[in-house]
Each structure stands twice: as structure tokens, then as C-alpha cells.
């Protein structure tokens, strides 16, 4: 049975894991790293994902997309999107349906598509390790993601060629990895501060039962915001000194961003770091190059980002209140996400909860490990684990006067189903529009509109007479479907919520086809590169053999080999893999005659003819050996 993989699709880095026996295991990518940068770069000839994309970001800033998770399921007019527009070097545009998309090299891509490219890399990483095709996955999302963002993540999986068996909340996944082997009853808080999002989740763990009591967070608070504080500080200081605004130069901005991230990481283990960026700009008056050499202390960094850390504590208060527990009731605080390595973050969390956080999990890998455990549960490989998660935000509809009427409150255990009867607002009203919202504000317009649909052909009747039953259904992924039924006529209408905007089935199918076509093109390009490498290697070895042994064969053989070499050299200048393979075949056959002549000459020098020596068996020089399979590299 094919493995179900667990993927942590992160804002800054992504990670893939599987169940290896009874324990989850992170899989290294083709570069040998356990996490992959969530970055996609587009060059003239190819698409790069992960570390190769990150390496070329400085020289190709407009065509390198990072932190796209912050855009997933969002609209162009959103305040957060407008803020990001000013900070990133790539273009954020209207996807045509009001959704925020990115534009690279004249092509528009949805955040789901960009995420799919990263998921494909994770899929390929798992396939290379397992030696078999992977088609199913569990993917994690921030606990505070709304329905539109969850749906968009599921779409990304589909575009990448994966059946997403479950969307699981990141803090819940981390709790699974933390509590898999723990038998005692505990109440834990998972504080998850990642690259782009923040979540706090309160759970009860009791011998394999993981019950989420409450969750809260901020989907626009993370390491990217910390980096931008440093970038703005560096740019301001440079402007004061040289009168040049580096934020207007996309290449300089990308260099600043990389320097800021590096400085932030270094200041987690040292008190001071130096930011050194030579030739970052030019003096407009003198034409002389300008260099940035600046010291940044941990104290200065903490003053720049102190309010961001404090901002994460408000959701912690709300989560404790919703769970009905006090700080003293929390037995363990688990830190998740790369930003929790920052000493000031650890200090503030310790001060808030009144206890030292648990240090036994790797904050970069624990979410992927939890996703793999959930994959194991769904596959039947992991027994005695029951996960009860919650919906992060209240769900309801707009009623008379624009009021938001809740049907399902936040932190309700999922899956769940809830119905309520409504009526018409006017006499003889023959249709109603059901507008579905998600959020905590009292007026519908202040919440997130998830979608709308009409229930028509209601028989004429006085206002308040018709009975319209509205039913909300939330599945285990946290994805919502809504139905409305006229109890008088039995007529009903239902939808699985698609964000106002979002990707239609046709959009997704087109993107799946594009992804498959690109995969085929990538495969052909790789085949061409490998064939060229093979040809170059053959040319080199043949040339060396002629230099060393050309005098041992007749001139006509050397001439035939040199002709074949010339033909292969010409073929290598083309982009035709078939032509190159033909050249390799011809040169291989020609070079074989050289090999035969060399062996004959060496045998003659040794005083024996080939006939005297007798025909050699292919197996003459092969030594039989017994190998013991130690099981270390067995693939399941």
C-alpha cells in the first residue's frame, strides 16, 4: 500500500515526513537538507524551487516569489495584502476575480499554484526516498486559517497531483508529535510563531486522545514581519547617512532582506552582528559605489520587534479564556516555529505562562512529524490516537439589518453540523439570498464573506410565515458546506463554500494540466542535461584514450573515431536529445575498435596471443561476495 505523506507547507520553509515503523521521520531533500525554502524562482528557461530559487533571488528579485502563504485565500483590497505589496519585490495583482495573485514574467499565478510548485518538490522528495509514487498527503495549515485559506490549500494539493486526505492545524500536528508516546493526562499550550503566521492552541492530552479546547492567532504575524522591521531600520539608517532610499531598488531590497534574516538568526546566539553589504548602491553625485557596513545588537533588534512579540500574547489571553483554563492549569508550553528560537520570544512566553517552555521538540520539524502521524492514523498504521480539533472562527449568515447571526461558535469541535430556521423579511417574498460569513464581529459586513447562494420559488406568503432551514456542515478539514431548505415545499439549495473569488473546478483542472505539462517539460529538460553530460564525459575519455594509445592502432581507426567525435561535438551544440544519443552511439561503437586494439597490443607485449590465452569468460574476474541486509536503508 502506497504511503501517505505529511507535509508542513510553511511560509518560509516546508518539510515532508513519513511514518517509519512506529515513529515519524523527516525526509531530506535532493540538496541534503531537512527543510526546503518555500521559494519559487522563474528564469528564462526554467522554474526553480527551494534552495536553488533562494540562491538566485538577489539577481532575479522580480521573478522570485516567497512568503506566498500570506496571500493564499486573500483578496486584493485586504489591508494585509496592500501592506505586502509595498514590501515584496515581485508583483501582487488582481487575479480577475478579486483574489490576490502574483505576476511573474507576464504570467499570472494564483497563490495555490505557487504553493503547488512547493508541494510538488515535497512530493518528489518523498518519492525519491521511498522509491515509489506518492499520491496522498496530509497538509498542515495555521489553526487560524479561515475557510477560504483552507480551501485554497486543498486546491494547491490537487494542482500538485496530491489527494489531500486531511487538512490539519499546525499546532495540533505539533501536539501529536509531542504527545505520541505520553500516557499521562496533560493540558498543554502550543505557541506557534512561524515565518508568516502565529497560532496559540490549548489542548488536553490523555493517553492517545488529543482534544483541542481552543485556538486563536494572527495569520499576518511572523518572521517575515520581524525581518521587515530590520530591513526598514537598515534602509532608514543608510538613507540618513547617504541620502539614498534602498527600498526603491528591488535588488538592493532583496539583499537587505537576506541580510536581515541572517542577522536575526545570528542574534539568537550572539549579542552583536555586523551587516556587510558592499556595492549596494551608488552616489548619484560622484558616481562612487556605496557600501553598507553596520553593527546590529540584540538589544536594538529587541527594541525594533518588541511590539510584535507583545502582539502575540493577546491571542494567548483569548485562547485561555475560551478554553476555560488559567495559566496555572497549563502543564507544558510547547514552542513551535523558527521564531521561537529568538531569546526574547522565549523570555516573554516564559513570563506570560509562568513556566519554562518545553525544549524537547525541533520547532522546524515537529509540525511535519505530526502531519505524518495523522497520515499514519488515516492509513491505519498508527493505532490508539484520536484527534478532536475545533473550528477557529464563528460561522453564520447575514440577517435583517446586516446583523451577523451565528450558527456555529468558534472553538466548536469538528466535524459538526448545525441547523436553524429563518423566515422572510417581506410579504410575498419569493426568494432569499443566503450570505455566509466567518468571523467574530457583530455586523456581517465586518466579517469575512465566504460565499452566497439563492433559494428561489418560495410560495407567496406574509413575512415571517415561510420556514427556511439553514444547515451548516463543517468536515474534519474545517471546510464548510451550507444548505437551505424551504420546509413548506421541500425545495433545497446547497453549496460547498468557495471563497467569493477562489478557484473554480475548471481553474483547478487547467492548473493541474499545466503542472503535468510542466512536469513533462522538466523531465525532458533533465533528460537533455543528463544526455549532454554523458556525451561530454564520453568525448573526454575517448580523447584521453587517443592521446595515450593512438599510436597502437592504424590511422584509419583513429580517423573514424575523430569523425565520430566531431559529429558528437556538433550534436552537443543542439538541444536535440535524440541527435545527441545518436552521436553517443556512433562514438561508442567507433571507440570500441580502439579498445580492442589496445587489449591486443597489451597481450602481444605480454608474450601471449589472444588465441593462446583462450576466450575469456565475462565472469573470470568476478569475485562472489555475501552481503548482509542490515535493514538500515530498507524502504517501506
UniProtKB/Swiss-Prot annotation:
Bias-annotated ranges (Acidic residues): 620-630
Phosphothreonine PTM sites in chain numbering: 197
InterPro entries for this protein: ATPase_NBD, Chaperone_DnaK, Heat_shock_70_CS, HSP70_C_sf, HSP70_peptide-bd_sf, Hsp_70_fam
Annotated spans, Disordered: 602-636
A Pfam family per the record: HSP70
Description of what induces expression: By stress conditions e.g. heat shock.
Record keywords: ATP-binding, Chaperone, Nucleotide-binding, Phosphoprotein, Stress response
GO molecular function: ATP binding; ATP-dependent protein folding chaperone; unfolded protein binding
Function: Acts as a chaperone.
Recorded family membership: Belongs to the heat shock protein 70 family.
Protein name: Chaperone protein DnaK
Organism of origin: Cereibacter sphaeroides (strain ATCC 17023 / DSM 158 / JCM 6121 / CCUG 31486 / LMG 2827 / NBRC 12203 / NCIMB 8253 / ATH 2.4.1.)
UniProt gene name: dnaK
Amino acid at each position: 500500500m502506497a504511503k501517505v505523506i505529511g507535509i508542513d507547507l510553511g511560509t518560509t520553509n516546508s518539510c515532508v515526513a513519513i511514518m517509519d515503523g512506529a515513529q515519524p521521520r523527516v525526509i531530506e531533500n535532493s540538496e541534503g537538507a531537512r527543510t526546503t525554502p518555500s521559494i519559487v524562482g522563474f528564469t528564462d528557461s526554467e522554474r526553480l524551487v527551494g534552495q536553488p530559487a533562494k540562491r538566485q533571488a538577489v539577481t532575479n528579485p522580480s521573478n522570485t516569489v516567497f512568503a506566498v502563504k500570506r496571500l493564499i485565500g486573500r483578496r486584493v483590497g485586504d489591508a494585509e495584502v496592500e501592506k505586502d505589496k509595498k514590501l515584496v519585490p515581485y508583483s501582487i495583482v488582481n487575479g480577475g476575480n478579486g483574489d490576490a495573485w502574483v505576476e511573474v514574467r507576464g504570467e499570472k499565478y494564483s497563490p495555490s499554484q505557487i504553493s503547488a510548485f512547493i508541494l510538488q518538490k515535497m512530493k518528489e522528495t518523498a518519492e525519491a526516498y521511498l522509491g515509489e509514487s506518492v499520491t496522498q498527503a496530509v497538509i498542515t495549515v495555521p489553526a487560524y486559517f479561515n475557510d477560504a485559506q483552507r480551501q485554497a490549500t486543498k486546491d494547491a494539493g490537487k494542482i500538485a497531483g496530491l489527494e489531500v486526505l486531511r487538512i490539519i492545524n499546525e499546532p495540533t500536528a505539533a501536539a501529536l508529535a509531542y504527545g505520541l508516546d505520553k500516557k499521562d493526562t496533560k493540558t498543554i499550550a502550543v505557541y506557534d510563531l512561524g515565518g508568516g503566521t502565529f497560532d496559540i492552541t490549548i489542548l488536553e492530552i490523555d493517553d492517545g486522545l488529543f482534544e483541542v479546547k481552543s485556538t486563536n492567532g494572527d495569520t499576518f504575524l511572523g518572521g517575515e514581519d520581524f525581518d521587515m522591521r530590520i530591513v526598514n531600520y537598515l534602509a532608514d539608517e543608510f538613507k540618513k547617512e547617504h541620502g539614498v532610499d534602498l527600498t526603491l531598488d528591488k535588488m538592493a531590497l532583496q539583499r537587505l532582506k537576506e541580510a536581515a534574516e541572517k542577522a536575526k538568526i545570528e542574534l539568537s546566539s550572539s549579542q552583536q552582528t555586523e551587516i556587510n553589504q558592499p556595492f549596494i548602491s551608488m552616489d548619484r553625485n560622484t558616481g562612487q559605489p556605496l557600501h553598507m557596513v553596520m553593527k546590529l545588537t540584540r538589544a536594538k533588534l529587541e527594541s525594533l520587534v518588541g511590539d510584535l512579540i507583545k502582539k502575540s500574547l493577546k491571542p494567548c489571553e483569548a485562547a485561555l479564556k475560551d478554553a476555560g483554563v488559567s495559566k496555572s492549569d497549563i502543564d507544558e508550553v510547547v514552542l513551535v516555529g523558527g521564531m521561537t528560537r529568538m531569546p526574547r520570544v522565549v523570555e516573554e512566553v516564559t513570563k506570560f505562562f509562568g513556566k519554562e517552555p518545553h525544549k524537547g521538540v525541533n520547532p522546524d520539524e515537529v509540525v511535519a512529524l505530526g502531519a505524518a502521524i495523522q497520515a499514519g492514523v488515516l492509513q491505519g498504521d498508527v493505532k490508539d490516537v484520536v484527534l478532536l480539533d475545533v473550528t477557529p472562527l464563528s460561522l453564520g449568515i447575514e440577517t435583517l439589518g446586516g446583523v451577523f447571526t451565528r450558527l456555529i461558535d468558534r472553538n466548536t469541535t469538528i466535524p459538526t453540523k448545525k441547523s436553524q430556521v429563518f423566515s422572510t423579511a417581506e410579504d410575498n417574498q419569493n426568494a432569499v439570498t443566503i450570505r455566509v460569513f466567518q468571523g467574530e464581529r457583530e455586523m456581517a459586513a465586518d466579517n469575512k464573506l465566504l460565499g452566497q447562494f439563492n433559494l428561489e420559488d418560495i410560495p407567496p406568503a406574509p413575512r415571517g410565515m415561510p420556514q427556511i432551514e439553514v444547515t451548516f456542515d463543517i468536515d474534519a478539514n474545517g471546510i464548510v458546506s451550507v444548505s437551505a431548505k424551504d420546509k413548506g415545499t421541500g425545495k433545497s439549495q446547497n453549496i460547498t463554500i468557495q471563497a467569493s473569488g477562489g478557484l473554480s473546478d475548471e481553474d483547478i483542472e487547467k492548473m493541474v494540466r499545466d503542472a503535468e505539462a510542466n512536469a513533462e517539460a522538466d523531465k525532458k529538460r533533465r533528460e537533455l542535461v543528463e544526455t549532454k553530460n554523458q556525451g561530454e564525459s564520453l568525448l573526454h575519455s575517448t580523447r584521453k584514450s587517443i592521446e595515450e594509445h593512438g599510436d597502437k592502432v592504424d590511422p584509419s581507426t583513429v580517423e573514424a573515431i575523430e569523425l565520430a567525435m566531431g559529429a558528437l561535438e556538433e550534436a552537443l551544440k543542439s538541444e536535440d536529445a535524440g541527435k545527441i544519443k545518436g552521436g553517443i552511439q556512433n562514438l561508442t561503437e567507433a571507440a570500441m575498435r580502439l579498445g580492442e586494439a589496445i587489449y591486443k597490443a597489451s597481450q602481444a607485449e605480454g608474450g601471449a596471443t589472444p588465441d593462446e590465452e583462450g576466450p575469456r569468460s565475462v565472469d573470470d574476474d568476478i569475485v562472489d561476495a555475501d552481503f548482509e541486509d542490515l535493514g538500515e536503508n530498507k524502504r517501506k
